[in-house]
Amino acid sequence: MRMYETIFIVQPDLGEEEMKGISTKVQDVIASMKGDFKRLEDWGPRKLAYPINKFARGRYYYLRFDGDSALIAELERRLRLDDKVIRYQSVKLEKEVALAAAIPTKVAEEEAVESAEETKVETTTVEE
């Protein structure tokens, strides 16, 4: 199974129940196709770069999951058939990229600690 992420945009004027229905439907598709659901984030309403179907704004959702190509095909088919979804895009993630993104955080923390230690040394020499 490979890791994927999908970002989809729904109409901005949907009610809470309709938005929950869409997110539940997406999670059900992943579960029915034996995928591994990781995360679903509601990024909220944002202005679109250009009007889509006469909408200037849309509510963005970020989805991360493990699955195969059949799962992607079924998920995109269901999103395409739903009139409330105005755009979607799925991307396959590489494991090396996901791990590499976590490594700079550790490096930045180590550099911050070293910087703090150097500041203490400089402060100590100034006080003497």
Curated annotation (Swiss-Prot):
Protein's job? Binds together with bS18 to 16S ribosomal RNA.
Species per Swiss-Prot/TrEMBL record:
Geotalea uraniireducens (strain Rf4) (Geobacter uraniireducens)
Q: Name one GO molecular function term.
A: small ribosomal subunit rRNA binding
One GO CC term on file: cytosolic small ribosomal subunit
Key words of the record: Ribonucleoprotein, Ribosomal protein, RNA-binding, rRNA-binding
Entry's Pfam families?
Ribosomal_S6
**Which family does the record claim for this protein?**
Belongs to the bacterial ribosomal protein bS6 family.
- Name the Gene Ontology biological process terms: translation
InterPro entries associated with the record: Ribosomal_bS6 (IPR000529), Ribosomal_bS6_sf (IPR035980), Ribosomal_S6_plastid/chlpt (IPR020814), Transl_elong_EF1B/ribsomal_bS6 (IPR014717)
The answer, when asked if Aminoacyl-tRNA synthetase is one of the entry's keywords, is no
Q: Under which name does UniProt file this protein?
A: Small ribosomal subunit protein bS6
Keyword Cytoplasm among record annotations: no
